[in-house]
Amino acid sequence: MTRKIAIYGKGGIGKSTTQQNTAAAMAHFYDKKVFIHGCDPKADSTRLILGGMPQKTLMDMLRDEGEEKITTENIVRVGYEDIRCVESGGPEPGVGCAGRGVITAIDLMEKNGAYTEDLDFVFFDVLGDVVCGGFAMPIRDGKAQEVYIVASGEMMAVYAANNICKGLVKYANQSGVRLGGIICNSRMVDLEREFIEEFAASIGTQMIHFMPRDNIVQKAEFNKQTVIEFDDTCNQAKEYGELARKIIENEMFVIPTPLKMDDLEAMVVKYGMTD
């Protein structure tokens, strides 16, 4: 059965990079069949998998050619290790609602049977925080059963993670979605691991993996590749492989208990963090 996973996190936290490298590790090290559906108007959720090739977004095709032209063959691109990719895209700047675009895109993909039964994983890479109903769609309407939140030891990243949990709680009973854990994408902040471990435990989940910071991630990106494709023997590739393994084997799925603001701020003060 295909596992459908939504990846959330504060804008700029490294969510798309983490998601693409994890998907690449699943396909390369564990022979998993993976589909990535980018739900960000920037349309950068699949760039590394596709070797930097710009992908025509579903919303662009919808505007330019009409719904009848949207087929799996026309819109889905295949990249590294046969990972299938689609980007929702968004409206023209200053016009329309990008969240509405996410809803339209996922509905069209389902209508066209893009999420085939042979897939092991479908990833929805979702813009920033749960800022509106459209971006909450993967968890609101049960499109994804699992959520992983990318965070770091910076206050605003944890604040965003806590807000995402509030959105998840709102929809958990109607959609069945559950939190699988927090991925700490390290910013090399003092006591970062301890902070995220305590935060995760306090909301009833786990820090599923601590991803160390390594410049090879940037080197791979400059070469328009994931770390896995760039050098699958390096330490960072092994870290992404370990995160992939933990997600594959994960059995801890919870409805989180978000912290009240006073409790979150007290935890931040305890670790001496300011953003």
From Swiss-Prot:
Binds 1 [4Fe-4S] cluster per dimer. The keyword 4Fe-4S applies. It holds the Pfam family Fer4_NifH. This is Nitrogenase iron protein 3. InterPro entries: NifH/chlL_CS, NifH/frxC, Nitrogenase_Fe_NifH, P-loop_NTPase. Its cofactor is [4Fe-4S] cluster. GO terms for biological process: nitrogen fixation. The gene is nifH3. Belongs to the NifH/BchL/ChlL family. Keywords: 4Fe-4S, ADP-ribosylation, ATP-binding, Iron, Iron-sulfur, Metal-binding, Nitrogen fixation, Nucleotide-binding, Oxidoreductase. Homodimer. The keyword Metal-binding applies. [4Fe-4S] cluster binds at residues 97, 132. Transmembrane segments: none annotated. It comes from Clostridium pasteurianum. The key enzymatic reactions in nitrogen fixation are catalyzed by the nitrogenase complex, which has 2 components: the iron protein and the molybdenum-iron protein. It catalyses: N2 + 8 reduced [2Fe-2S]-[ferredoxin] + 16 ATP + 16 H2O = H2 + 8 oxidized [2Fe-2S]-[ferredoxin] + 2 NH4(+) + 16 ADP + 16 phosphate + 6 H(+). Its EC number is 1.18.6.1. GO terms for molecular function: 4 iron, 4 sulfur cluster binding; ATP binding; metal ion binding; nitrogenase activity. ATP binds at residues 9-16. The modification ADP-ribosylarginine is found at residue 100. The reversible ADP-ribosylation of Arg-100 inactivates the nitrogenase reductase and regulates nitrogenase activity.
